[in-house]
Amino acid sequence: MTEPQREFTEDAFLGGQLRLRQPRSGHRAGHDAMLLAAATPAQSGDRVVDFGAGIGAAGLAVARRVAGIRLVLVEIDAALTDLARGNASANAIVAETIVLDVSAGAEAFATAGLAPDSADVVLMNPPFNDPARHRVSPDKAREIAHVATAATLENWIHAARRTLKSGGVLTLIWRADGLAEVLAALDRGFGSLAILPVHGEPTSPAIRVIIRAIKGGKAPTRLYAALMLNDEKAAPNKQVQEILAGKGVLLGVP
């Protein structure tokens, strides 16, 4: 007799350095989370806050690369937060988990232990599908994870600006056709931008942008050469494969 299909899967990331339990259906962690983590700088002792952490994939990937960070995983969905907590424990990573709507405001953040000017690094993969152009999923968790309201991006960036110390780093991944929205939101309080377009293949337009910004930064914006997920023959890009195996970084991360 065959075993009934399980509600969850356990998947290997970073070449097996990280094993994460996640729902079989709904929003699932994948390439975006690992690319975001690879572009996020951190040092031992830094307080690193992952907004919209889901099962914890991006934040835990940073913690696997940089030992000794003080990781905080923030997620609105209590069930996903439980998975994130379990994933941290299963991978022997110390992480604080908080059930919180990133758009909730300063008072809710302070109550949850996220005071203003308290983080060295914030990373985030906000819901980014335009509801006007995206068919809403009947899966509520998937809808929350993928579909943005008009104010989602601005609210999340405002929360990052409030939470970060002066000179703190924000790294985010967003859809490429929404680059103008990101730049407009970052124009208030952030600078020293580094921008990396991500393409599915060399002949196609970018599908994602990864952006790193510094709170109060004054340096000129840097536009990096595009990252191709696949080459002209649709074969996986070697650099991307190294990143997914936990052997590479992006945007000059040390």
Predicted regions and their residues:
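Class I SAM-dependent transferase core
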Residues: T2-Q43
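Mobile active-site "lid"/loop adjacent to the S-adenosyl-L-methionine
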Residues: P126-N155
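Residue-level signal for inorganic ion chemistry
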Residues: L36, W156, A213
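Conserved Class I SAM-dependent methyltransferase catalytic core
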Residues: S25, A29, T149-A206
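Conserved beta-strand segments of alpha/beta enzyme cores
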Residues: R19, R70, V94-E96, G191-A194
